[in-house]
UniProtKB/Swiss-Prot annotation:
Enzymatic reactions: a 1,2-diacyl-sn-glycero-3-phosphocholine + H2O = a 1-acyl-sn-glycero-3-phosphocholine + a fatty acid + H(+)
Cofactor: Ca(2+)
EC number: 3.1.1.4
Organism: Bungarus multicinctus
InterPro entries reported in the protein's UniProt record: PLipase_A2, PLipase_A2_Asp_AS, PLipase_A2_dom, PLipase_A2_dom_sf, PLipase_A2_His_AS
Name recorded for this polypeptide: Acidic phospholipase A2 beta-bungarotoxin A6 chain
Bound cofactor: record note: Binds 1 Ca(2+) ion.
Disulfide bridges in this chain: C44-C136, C46-C62, C61-C117, C68-C110, C78-C103, C96-C108
Amino acid sequence: AVCVSLLGAANIPPQHLNLYQFKEMIRYTIPCEKTWGEYADYGCYCGAGGSGTPIDALDRCCYVHDNCYGDAAKIRGCDPKTQSYSYKLTQRTIICYGAAGTCARVVCDCDRTAALCFGNSEYIEGHKNIDTKRHCQ
């Protein structure tokens, strides 16, 4: 099946919340039958918090994203969860704009890398809503 996205070549202006932008990136890269919300409680790292060893490639995407946000937070005044940025969705890829090393660009690159990783990783239904106390130590 072919998934047609109206976002395909749209320039997305900065939004007030980074979560909206990250959600749009995810929606652009994942299979049509999935929703971005299905990635919000997956494995040990996709969603709030995170601990233990990632359980698969998709969970590793979230682990890397969490660490990337941790690095971004070291930039003076940078809050990755609320930092907006400029980007473009085009030809099945994502382009981040802005000066290298700035909070906005670093956060955009974190989200871009994670979204593309999601699109290239298998989604295993049994890894959604797992008991993290049991599986993520």
